[in-house]
């Protein structure tokens, strides 16, 4: 493994409609088989529905939903003297967003609604109201970290 320098993270282009890098990242996470225009259509349609339900702008509503799913701590496995401990660690800001977006998309895909846009809109609405599968996932991760607080001194 080369040890010369740390490669910085690539800059992604902001999405064309709202000019948000966060939304562009979300579209990229939702995208399947390189079909970006399809993913954009789904996201924009879902955001429109979300904005109508919440009475806020599309970006504000999306930000609120994302904020309610972002984890602050997670557990990482750490091997110490033949046994593995789940050590709670703080989540870096970039990873917080990535995990939240991934969980929202996963939860939306598992829903039983008709179209993906509707599934995504419903999941984002639930996330904005602090309920739903994605929020439950965050609660589970936080609970796991809380339960393993005793191993926090094994941080690296």
From Swiss-Prot:
The keyword RNA-binding applies. GO terms for molecular function: rRNA binding; structural constituent of ribosome; tRNA binding. InterPro entries: Ribosomal_uS7 (IPR000235), Ribosomal_uS7_bac/org-type (IPR005717), Ribosomal_uS7_CS (IPR020606), Ribosomal_uS7_dom (IPR023798), Ribosomal_uS7_dom_sf (IPR036823). It holds the Pfam family Ribosomal_S7. The keyword rRNA-binding applies. PROSITE patterns: RIBOSOMAL_S7. It comes from the Bacteria. Keywords: Ribonucleoprotein, Ribosomal protein, RNA-binding, rRNA-binding, tRNA-binding. One of its GO terms (biological process) is translation. One of its GO terms (cellular component) is small ribosomal subunit. Part of the 30S ribosomal subunit. Contacts proteins S9 and S11. One of the primary rRNA binding proteins, it binds directly to 16S rRNA where it nucleates assembly of the head domain of the 30S subunit. Is located at the subunit interface close to the decoding center, probably blocks exit of the E-site tRNA. Belongs to the universal ribosomal protein uS7 family. NCBIfam families: rpsG_bact. This is Small ribosomal subunit protein uS7. It comes from Klebsiella pneumoniae subsp. pneumoniae (strain ATCC 700721 / MGH 78578). The lineage of its organism: Bacteria, Pseudomonadati, Pseudomonadota, Gammaproteobacteria, Enterobacterales.
């Amino acid at each position: 493994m080369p040890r010369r320098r740390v490669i910085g993270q690539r800059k992604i282009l902001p999405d064309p409609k709202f000019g948000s890098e966060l939304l562009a990242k979300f579209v990229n996470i939702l995208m399947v088989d390189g079909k970006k225009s399809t993913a954009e259509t789904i996201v924009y349609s879902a955001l429109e529905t979300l904005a109508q339900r919440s009475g806020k702008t599309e970006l504000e509503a999306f930000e609120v939903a994302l904020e309610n799913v972002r984890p602050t701590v997670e557990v990482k496995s750490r091997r110490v003297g033949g046994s593995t401990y789940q050590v709670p660690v703080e989540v870096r800001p970039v990873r917080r967003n990535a995990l939240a977006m991934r969980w929202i998309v996963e939860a939306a895909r598992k829903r039983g609604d008709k179209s993906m846009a509707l599934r995504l809109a419903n999941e984002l609405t639930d996330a904005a109201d602090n309920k739903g599968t994605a929020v439950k996932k965050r609660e589970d991760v936080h609970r796991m970290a809380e339960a393993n607080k005793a191993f926090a001194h094994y941080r690296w």
